[in-house]
Swiss-Prot record:
Family the UniProt entry places it in: Belongs to the UppP family.
Gene giving rise to this polypeptide: uppP
Record's protein name: Undecaprenyl-diphosphatase
Listed InterPro entries: UppP (IPR003824)
UniProt topology in membrane: Multi-pass membrane protein
Length: 272
């Protein structure tokens, strides 16, 4: 792969990663399709995808830095408060949201990696879309937690249980957690924010583990390509998160569910 071509591929995949990582549409499904169409597959491609996820994670940190620092007791000025009462989101909420998927992910890490194939991703796209529709149809008419700071520890833990569905490649971590939050009585907006905050430790841990296992596939020659992908993913993810949070104030997740079905059909057409 020529230098110019490899950098172009990196930029395209960075855009795809940044656009889809935090939307409930499955970044995995999109990366599989686009990577296949670009002829960028194999061990190096998998390592590249792990690295550019760090760019997406950095976008969340930049967006929610004040809230994230506040969770660990470091305060800069007045802390944000989004709720109807005096409650506050704590580090305990994040930890409870992490526990179920961390335990299952560590125990079944190799098994989960073996599930990364187009068939499983296609089915996960469909099932995840159905869950989004179910969440919109079955959520309480009046959310019990309108704001992020109204969330209970029980709601955080149950969202963590739903996050386990995202261990199924193609399901979408944000789709699973947001759907779970809505079914637990958390508003669409607050569930999305919690999903983003929960993504930081979850994705950093998973990425660190994957990088450790993929370290041998990294070469000095790949650094420019990986850097372009990382920066592109960061910039695009930053824009995507801001746009998404504004969008869900006006629309439901039904269009995202329909889009997932379209992507599932695309996976079928491309690979079968």
């Amino acid at each position: 792969m020529s230098d110019i071509h490899s950098l172009l591929v990196a930029a395209i995949l960075g855009v795809v990663e940044g656009l889809t990582e935090f939307l409930p549409v499955s970044s995995t499904g999109h990366m599989i399709i686009v990577g296949h169409l670009l002829g960028f597959e194999g061990d190096t491609a998998e390592t590249f995808e792990v690295v550019i996820q760090l760019g997406s994670i950095l976008a969340v940190v930049v967006m929610f830095w004040r809230r994230l620092f506040g969770l660990i007791g470091i305060h800069f000025g007045k802390q944000p408060h989004e709720g109807t009462g005096k409650g506050r989101l704590t580090l305990g909420h994040i930890v409870l949201g992490m526990i179920p998927a961390v335990v299952l992910g560590l125990v079944f890490h190799d098994t989960i990696k073996s599930l990364f194939n187009p068939v499983n991703v296609m089915y996960a796209l469909v099932v995840g879309g159905l869950l989004l529709i179910a969440a919109e149809c079955l959520k309480p008419k009046e959310p019990r937690a309108p704001g992020l700071d109204d969330m209970t520890y029980r709601q955080a833990f149950m969202i963590g249980c739903f996050q386990c569905l995202a261990l199924w490649p193609g399901f979408s971590r944000s789709g699973a957690t947001i759907s779970g939050g809505m079914l637990m009585g958390v508003s669409r907006y607050a569930a999305s924010e919690f999903s983003f905050l929960l993504a930081v430790p979850m994705m950093m841990g998973a990425t660190a583990l994957d990088l450790y296992k993929s370290w041998s596939f990294l070469t000095v020659e790949d650094i420019p390509m990986f850097a372009v992908g990382f920066v592109t993913a960061f910039i695009v993810a930053l824009i995507a998160i801001k746009t998404f949070l504004q969008l869900i104030k006006r629309i439901s997740f039904i269009p995202f569910a329909i889009y997932r079905f379209i992507v599932a059909a695309a996976v079928y057409v491309v690979f079968f």
